[in-house]
Structure formats: C-alpha cells, structure tokens
Amino acid sequence: MNLNLKTVIKTINKFKPLKFRQEVIHQSKYLKIINDSKSTTLSSTVPFLESNEKIIWILGGLFKKGDKFNLNKKYFKNLEAYIYGKDRQVFLKLFKNKIKVNLSKDLRNTLKLIPNLKDIRTKVTVLFSPSAASFDQYKNFEERGRQFNMLIKRYLPIE
C-alpha cells in the first residue's frame, strides 16, 4: 500500500470528535474545560480524575445502582466535586470524607458556585462528566451537553 503521509495527516486532521464525548471546549495556558456529558457511570469518569492537576468535577443526575467509585486516595486532594440533580445525596454519601463536595439542585446553580477562573495561575481542569443518567432534568445526554456549553459561556466567563 502506497500512502502519502501528508495526505494521511491532512485527512486525520479533518475528523471532528463526537459531541459531548471528552470534548475539549476550552483550552488555555492554565484552564481546560471538558464536556463529557455522555459519561453515565463513575467507572467511565475515574480515568479522567487520575491527575496531579486540580480538577473541578461537575456531576449529577440519576445514579446507576451498583456503580463504584474506585479512585486511588492519592488523587483526592486535587479533586473538588460540584454535584447537582435528583441523586446528589447518593453521590454525597459515596464521597463523604474523601473529597470536597458542593451541592446544588441543577446545573445552572452548580456553575454559579464555581469560583471565578479568569485569574487562575495554576493548571485547572473543569470536567463535566456527570457519571449518571440525565433523565431527571434532561431528555438525553445531548441536551445536557448543549446546556452545559451554553451555561459555561454565561457563568464562567473565560475570555
């Protein structure tokens, strides 16, 4: 097979990632914002949390019974959870005495709780990885993902 490397690279660069699946919606020197609205379990989120950088984790919705939170303790200090939705108390019990937690009834109010990120000088990732089903407040994960993107622009001005 005879392939032109430039053509292959050009073709690969044309691919667009699927919406709301580990989608980086903002990246600057100190701040990265990821929309992973597709995530509906804790186990699908844990690999993202294994970082030495500060992570602001936004999650919530309908907890899937039997799901486990298996994150190594060494990452707890870098993690702060902002939990919304119907089963926020279920998540609170899972995380109690492990990570710092903030509770809110919905995504809009959750984003209002997050401190201003405009002047940060250390690396921070805002990770929207709900780790739960969306049906308590949204029709599906796509609607939830679109709502997150819209609310980020409104409540976390970053430019």
Regions found by a protein language model. Name each.
Residues 42, 90, 132-136:
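Short glycine-rich, flexible loops that bind phosphorylated cofactors or substrates
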Residues 126-131:
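Short beta-strands and strand-loop turn motifs
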Residues 1-5, 118, 156:
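Short, hydrophobic alpha-helical segments
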Residues 137-141:
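Short, solvent-exposed loop/turn segments at secondary-structure boundaries
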Residues 65-124:
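C-terminal helical cap/extension that packs against the catalytic core
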Residues 149-159:
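Short, flexible loop segments at boundaries between secondary-structure elements
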Residues 1-78:
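Nucleotide phosphate-binding/pyrophosphate-handling subdomain across enzymes
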